[in-house]
């Protein structure tokens, strides 16, 4: 909302589609889907339909940017931070289902706006957004767009910083109480209850704190403690360098998935990693083996939920969750002791003497 608020849009007038659900797809996306094996992309039909057909108040603009690359804490340490090509092209792909027979946007009096943006190249973003939005927002100036883009980036940084701070508090609590926690390694859309099926919620109900890899704390003291020896030995150039395990570091989320495996292996109180992946995700498939090997070689438990799609198989998920918690109850203390014995001295997560 930082970008839109800076342009003068009242937050009360900004409407977001609801969480993904089968009902949403049936009610609003039926007959408008496109041929794509990527389940998260197919879900967008329901979201578009909900915004076009399911609102009590009339919408003026449907904003769905095509994002080429993403800002990442790994930027500058990896080759590129590109988005998945399917996700980048999804707005135009899904749009086709709403204009193939008649223009549903025009009939609803909605302007469809889909600017192409390179979010990891902030100097390009104002021009990209200005060119993509000036027809929909008469009177918009480049200067206003640049100021709004800065506000948007600041809002994103503030949001990430708040969540990373909370994650650090969780880790410090685990270190202080000598308790195990779990890390979820997945793509951002798996936080959507209709795509990730709230598997992490089921696990948390057993009393285990959950950390998401995207918001792991990256404070300098923690990074130097976890990766400093490898940096000084010349194995990697920085705490965020993944070339030792993933030389082809072009995809933003893939890069962060590999880095998440590395950091989970190094933090003693992360006793288990849970990997999530959607059905036939071509970007994830090459990472299955390296991620599992990195995690398991540290003695950390590893479980994966692959090929997630529209259906939550409640029975099998329940069995998997019970299996994970059984192994944690049985082995977590041993895992923590083994990882603590191997950790460098001076862990900043522990209370100072």
What name fits each language-model region?
Residues 1-353:
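An N-terminal assembly and electron-transfer interface module characteristic of large anaerobic redox
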């Amino acid at each position: 909302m930082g970008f839109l608020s800076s342009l003068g849009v009242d937050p009360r007038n900004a409407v977001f589609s609801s969480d993904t659900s089968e009902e949403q797809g049936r009610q609003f996306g039926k007959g408008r889907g496109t041929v794509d094996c990527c389940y998260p992309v197919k879900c967008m039909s329901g979201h578009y339909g909900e915004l076009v057909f399911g609102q009590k108040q009339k919408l003026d603009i449907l904003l769905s940017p095509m994002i080429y690359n993403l800002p990442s804490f790994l930027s500058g340490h990896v080759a590129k931070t590109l988005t998945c090509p399917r996700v980048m092209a999804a707005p135009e792909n899904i749009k086709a289902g709403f204009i193939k027979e008649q223009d549903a946007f025009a009939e609803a009096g909605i302007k469809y706006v889909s600017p192409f943006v390179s979010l990891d190249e902030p100097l390009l973003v104002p021009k990209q957004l200005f060119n993509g939005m000036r027809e929909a927002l008469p009177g918009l100036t480049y200067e206003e767009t640049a100021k709004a883009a800065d506000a948007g980036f600041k809002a994103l940084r503030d949001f990430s910083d708040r969540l990373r701070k909370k994650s650090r508090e969780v880790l410090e609590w685990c270190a202080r109480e000598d308790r195990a926690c779990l890390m979820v390694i997945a793509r951002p859309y798996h936080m959507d209850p209709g795509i990730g099926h709230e598997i992490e919620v089921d696990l948390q109900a057993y009393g285990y704190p959950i950390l998401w890899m995207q918001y792991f704390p990256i404070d300098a003291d923690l990074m130097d403690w976890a990766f400093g020896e490898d940096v000084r030995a010349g194995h990697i150039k920085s705490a965020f360098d993944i070339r030792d395990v993933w030389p082809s570091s072009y995809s933003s989320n893939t890069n962060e998935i590999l880095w998440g495996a590395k950091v989970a292996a190094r933090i003693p109180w992360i006793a288990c990693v849970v990997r999530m992946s959607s059905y036939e995700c071509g970007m994830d498939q090459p990472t299955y083996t390296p991620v599992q090997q990195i995690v398991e070689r540290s003695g950390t438990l590893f479980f994966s939920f692959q090929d997630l799609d529209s259906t939550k198989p409640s029975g099998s998920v329940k069995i998997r969750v019970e299996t994970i918690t059984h192994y944690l109850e049985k082995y977590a203390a041993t895992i923590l002791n083994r990882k603590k014995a191997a950790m460098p001295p001076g862990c900043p997560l522990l209370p100072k003497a």
